[in-house]
A protein has these predicted regions:
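Short, hydrophobic/π-rich interface segment
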Residues: 77-97
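A broad, low-specificity signal marking well-ordered, structured residues that form hydrophobic/aromatic
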Residues: 42-43, 68, 120
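Structural alpha-beta junctions
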Residues: 20-22, 95-101
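Short beta-strand-to-loop capping motifs
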Residues: 72-76, 124-126
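Active-site-adjacent structural patch at catalytic or cofactor/ligand-binding sites
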Residues: 48-49, 63-74
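Short, charged interaction patches at domain edges and termini
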Residues: 1-13, 36, 50-63, 99-133
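Small/polar-rich, solvent-exposed N-terminal microdomains that initiate assembly or binding
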Residues: 1-56, 78-85
Length: 133
C-alpha cells in the first residue's frame, strides 16, 4: 500500500497522544469489509490520494501531493457530539510542518456498525527520489 511510512508515522503520533488513549487507531486493509457493531471508538487510516510529477530531466526526482484519510467511528450510545471532539483532538495531534491541507466531512451514520462516522483528510507535499536501475 502506498503512503505506508506516512500513515505509520501518523498512527504512532496519535497512539502516543494522552488525550486519545480511548480510541483505537488502525491501518486500513483494502478489499476487506467486516461490518460489526462497535462498542468503542475506532479510527482507521488509509491512503486517500497521491499525485506525483517528475521534476528532473532524468526522471529520478518526483514531487507532488499526498493525502491520508482518517475515518473515525463512534458508537451511537456515546452520542454524536463526542465524534466532533475526538476528531478535533486527532487533527490537532496530527499537525506538523508537513501538513498543508485539512478537510473534514459532514457527519454520517453507518447503520451496519451502529455508529457515527466522521472523515478527515490530511494533505501534504510529497517528494520521492528514485535511483536508476
Amino acid at each position: 500500500m502506498y503512503l505506508n511510512k506516512e500513515i505509520d508515522e501518523v498512527i504512532h503520533t496519535l497512539r502516543n497522544t494522552n488525550e486519545l488513549k480511548e480510541i483505537s487507531f488502525l491501518k486500513a486493509f483494502p478489499y476487506v469489509t467486516k461490518p460489526t457493531r462497535l462498542s468503542k471508538r475506532c479510527a482507521v487510516l488509509s491512503p486517500n490520494s497521491l499525485e506525483l510529477e517528475s521534476v528532473s530531466v532524468d526522471n529520478t526526482d518526483f514531487y507532488g501531493t499526498g493525502e491520508i484519510r482518517i475515518d473515525l467511528f463512534c458508537p451511537y450510545h456515546l452520542g454524536s457530539p463526542v465524534i466532533f471532539d475526538d476528531m478535533q483532538k486527532i487533527v490537532k495531534a496530527s499537525l506538523n510542518d508537513e501538513i498543508s491541507k485539512i478537510s473534514i466531512s459532514a457527519i454520517s451514520v453507518d447503520s451496519s456498525c451502529e455508529c457515527y462516522v466522521l472523515t478527515a483528510v490530511l494533505g501534504f507535499g510529497y517528494y520521492e527520489k528514485t535511483e536508476d536501475l
